[in-house]
């Protein structure tokens, strides 16, 4: 079982990378605060701060409040004018965002798409939109690009695996499309996993995020890190078999959870009402349509049965439901009721079941976090410094 740990540095707890991580995680620290926190000698600390400043990682900001004497100045992470390009794709729509280094959207555009269409027809407009949004900024520096997809993604390479959702795409379609335009750090992640990371309130939390849109996806975050599993398939709950003789799933088996509770399953059940998309179903539910409400209740009940096992296994702090179907108030309540009925009290004690933020916002925040970790994690910074030192030594 693999947990994608938050990176650790090659150089120890007082390396350049760890010092930058300490500064980046705070809202500014004085030199005295850094001396007290790190235990470093003044000479060593100041040398490393000078190096990080020269290389553009940090800067000295406004003075801290002082009760007397010379006011101290904050040492802050250099995030001014630095942005990330986030492409968050669902099965029927996508959002292109320019974010700051915390994942806050500065500019964005959302439009409809069909993820099963050929890769070029989906990705080319996204890349073009990203380029245009970047051109609207003034004096911004693009640090990297993050892409979230409704498909399994291989950690590290960013290659798409088991392409049921996007059958016409090659494993490296996304990598090629992005790298053809930007030669910058790139992170590609499953959409539910990115959203799970974006939904966490702190790195101490265990969060299970379930997206119910056209399909069903699940992301699991433990202590700030994505749980991937032995082969990268942790959280693929859509193909849990709920019944041997249930409805046919797209994977070819009968009775999968997705065949009962996904937006696609609801569309098949409610097709005679002309409800073709998840947003059509949610709109009909908002009007109180009795057949739609019953279908949603049935889907939520089956999903709750499956999630009871997930909750019992992981004992999360929060179970978050997202997606155009999953975040519907009545749907969340039905899932919560079934989960709390099926798990023992000590497992459910203190657990919060709730609707998430808008799915694009959660995934956008999560994918930005992953891009920032890739670039500025202690091990990444220390590795860069080590390589430069080796190169200088000749």
Q: What do the PLM-derived regions correspond to, one by one?
A:
Residues 92-94, 152-154, 217:
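Short, acidic Gly/Pro/Ser/Thr-rich loop/turn segments
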Residues 84-88, 142-146, 207-211, 217-219:
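Short glycine-aspartate micro-motif
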Residues 105-206, 330-341:
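Glycine-rich phosphate-binding loop and adjoining helix at the ATP-binding site
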Residues 1-127, 131-136, 140-141, 257-394:
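ATP-binding/phosphotransfer module of carbohydrate and carboxylate kinases, centering on a glycine-rich
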Residues 64, 150-153, 213-215, 325-326:
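Short glycine-rich anion-binding loops that position phosphate/pyrophosphate groups of nucleotides
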Residues 100, 155, 221:
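Short, acidic, Ser/Thr-enriched surface-loop or helix-capping motifs
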Residues 108-110, 117-122, 169-290, 394:
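Glycine/GP-enriched mid-protein hinge/lid loop-to-helix segment characteristic of carbohydrate kinases
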